Amino acid sequence: MSQAATPAADGKVKISIDPLTRVEGHLKIEVEVKDGKVVDAKCSGGMFRGFEQILRGRDPRDSSQIVQRICGVCPTAHCTASVMAQDDAFGVKVTTNGRITRNLIFGANYLQSHILHFYHLAALDYVKGPDVSPFVPRYANADLLTDRIKDGAKADATNTYGLNQYLKALEIRRICHEMVAMFGGRMPHVQGMVVGGATEIPTADKVAEYAARFKEVQKFVIEEYLPLIYTLGSVYTDLFETGIGWKNVIAFGVFPEDDDYKTFLLKPGVYIDGKDEEFDSKLVKEYVGHSFFDHSAPGGLHYSVGETNPNPDKPGAYSFVKAPRYKDKPCEVGPLARMWVQNPELSPVGQKLLKELYGIEAKKFRDLGDKAFSIMGRHVLVAEETWLTAVAVEKWLKQVQPGAETYVKSEIPDAAEGTGFTEAPRGALLHYLKIKDKKIENYQIVSATLWNANPRDDMGQRGPIEEALIGVPVPDIKNPVNVGRLVRSYDPULGCAVHVLHAETGEEHVVNID
């Protein structure tokens, strides 16, 4: 992992961090800094995936197992999208108990993923760990809680409060994995979700075991996670003004609440150019103008006719990530998008602490205004969505029917198409499946990472992370901590140590971005 800071004649300094993440490919971030702020940014995916090619010619039912290997953090999301695409193509309607069982599997994965995001991928940007590996070496000018809070005793107490939760969160995540495995067979890479529903018929004993584990997770979210996030935000108030971006969001909807998939816990929708719109799948296109891919015709392609033709030598390209657009506009996806579209009530803890710590009267999510689109706003909404998911899991546990059927048998059609729309913890996810002669003829995946971490499109518009980086403060080019904070607020699963090499002196600076 390396980072180079290169001076330029116009007073800019280019900082290149490569790779910035280990999950879902290698993410490279390049920013140009002038007068202590980012003035330009490029987000590059440096590894070709090619899962679409792997799936061609296979039994359609294989897809839900193969696509889970895309990501070890959210395989359940890819499985969900895949089986929904198969349900659509096979013409099968899942039973009520099958739908609820799927929600319980996926809901537990949501809880785990969100807790992972903050505590083990982002928290050490703010909380100081002990002076032992892997917490050291740490970079200078880290701007941690212990640096921000001037009262030494209060600083140490607040930092210890956060660090203790960091350790406890490991245990909570293990419990969430057990919850997934109880109905999903195992975690990661669940086996219990298939076309037609779920393979596990819940029993009263299993429901009780799941519920007992869930209570511990729910208690952690309410009593520890939410209070820590709001306490952290009260210290880093400037990060509620940083990383705003395009302010366009899109959500596909997740956790169906009826058997016809007409209502969802978090509904589909679009907020673009300051207006709410209904989601129309026909308006989704992928562009490759600055991606290492070729299209057979100019312009963007709808996912149903999508092409995956790699060209690593393409002039002007800088990423193996395509550029999805809605109405030709870049859109952010993830908890921010879902919560903005749904606009649910904030948790009682959140409403109370916003008033006590910030002096803000906020009942619903949109009451936060532009603060929601910031670095710290994203962390707040992830915590709030974790609470909202926990409330839903508690409801589903009351709805699930022990002993009731969860699976509907179906046959592979000779020819068919199907699309699965859902939401990974990181954001909007779709899988498109085309069957010919009972085999997969075409398979296309538009993942959350594509939506958020994409490069410029054919029109020259920056991707969401690229745009959000503009204006981010970088007072010390050797320690661009806010660049890492911004990218991590999108949950791209980071965990690396970065070295900065000064282009003129050759001096090396260790930059820990864990």
Swiss-Prot record:
Pfam families the UniProt entry points to: NiFeSe_Hases
The record's comment on cofactor binding reads: Binds 2 irons ions. Iron 1 has 3 cyanide and carbon monoxide ligands. Iron 2 has 3 water ligands. Binds 1 nickel ion per subunit.
Binding site residues for Fe cation 2: E52, I445, H499
Q: Name one GO cellular component term.
A: periplasmic space
User: Which top EC class is named for this enzyme in its record?
Assistant: oxidoreductase
Q: For Fe cation 1, which residues are the binding ones?
A: C74, C496
Assembly, in brief, is: Heterodimer of a large and a small subunit.
**Protein family membership:** Belongs to the [NiFe]/[NiFeSe] hydrogenase large subunit family.
> Under which name does UniProt file this protein?
Periplasmic [NiFeSe] hydrogenase large subunit
Q: Which organism is it from?
A: Desulfomicrobium baculatum
